[in-house]
Amino acid sequence: MNDIYVTGHRNPDTDAIVAAMAYANLRNALGDREYKAIRIGPINDETRSMLDRFGFEPPMFVKTMRTQISDIEFDTPPELNCGVSMDLAWRIMREGQIATIPIVRDDGTLHGMLSAGDIASYDMQTIYDAHIEALPVFNLLSVLEGQLVNEFGSNVETITGDVVLALPQTYGNPQLTEPSSIVICGDQPEIIDAALKAGVCCLIICQADVDAHLTDYDGGTCIISTPLDARRVGRLIFQAMPVEHVSKTGDIICFHLADYLDDVRELMLKSRYRCYPVLDENDHVVGTLSRFHLLRPKRKRVVLVDH
């Protein structure tokens, strides 16, 4: 972004090429800024022969000096993997004051964009829909600061079911005996025994000592203990879901480092997104761009030289 380009005239001859290379090398030797020799036209046979004779590569060809995204400053927020929990994503966005963050696949390509509004919208939906689909146990343990109690739980990768917050009067609740339920309880032996008897997929025990018979339990229930209270667990369990389930995907407007700012402005005027992902030549995410970055962009700086 801070490079200064040095070039001769169009349709350069040997003098123009050599002058650009010499001046760029001189300024780089002085060490004040980074200078790059370029050419804005095809190189002729005489110049190529001369460069080959002395072992020099011709300067890079630049077709136009129009400003590109690679020439300006843009945001470089941390990229989050698809499997990261919403709880961690929310904390990163809050601490870094980031409005929107890119979600990337394992190979670094874009999966989607996640905003604070996406997390809030999902959180509101969980009030009316307590179902959880394919929640990674690793995420759940991390968010709840929990530990696996029984050996069977270490073989479980994901859990699926309806979240049930067991109160004393919940003992007769039909959901408590559903194998697909995820039961949250405290130091309630009757509830624990009923849940294990029903074979619920997951039992989360809050702020209670774990009995030895639970450690040795080898049934089809993943048992987790946590130092958090049941109210917090009931909220955080939904925040353990991977961000890939709530991030915006599909028709995302992306820009590449080589895109020209004039073209970028036109596309931005036709849409109302807060920010846009910036990709490199391999479609890897390198940052985000917003309208703010286009207000006073830095232009390419050029030095024109000749003999």
Go through the PLM ranges and name each one.
Residues 130, 215-248:
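Long, charge-dense
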Residues 36, 60-61, 101-102, 182-185, ...:
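Short hydrophobic alpha-helical runs that function as membrane-insertion/retention elements
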